[in-house]
Amino acid sequence: MLSWAVTFLVVALIAAVLGFGGIAGTAIEIAKIIFFVAIVLFVISAVAGLMRRGRAS
């Protein structure tokens, strides 16, 4: 799950670079949405991983 969050974060950053660089004007809003979704998924994955690691010990 953490790998999916990191993947979405990378995709969002690439879309942001392309959008803010003027290549695709509409990609700016899409990049913002994907970026925040990726951040939320990353936080959820990190918390779930910490909880899982805590139970395994």
Swiss-Prot record:
Compartments (UniProt record): Cell membrane
UniProt keyword terms in alphabetical order: Cell membrane, Membrane, Transmembrane, Transmembrane helix
Record-linked InterPro entries: DUF1328
Highest rank taxon of the organism: Bacteria
Transmembrane segments: 4-24, 30-50
Family matches, as Pfam families: DUF1328
Membrane topology: Multi-pass membrane protein
Gene Ontology cellular component terms for the protein in this record: plasma membrane
Family to which the UniProt record says this protein belongs: Belongs to the UPF0391 family.
Protein's name in the database: UPF0391 membrane protein Xaut_1725
Originating organism: Xanthobacter autotrophicus (strain ATCC BAA-1158 / Py2)
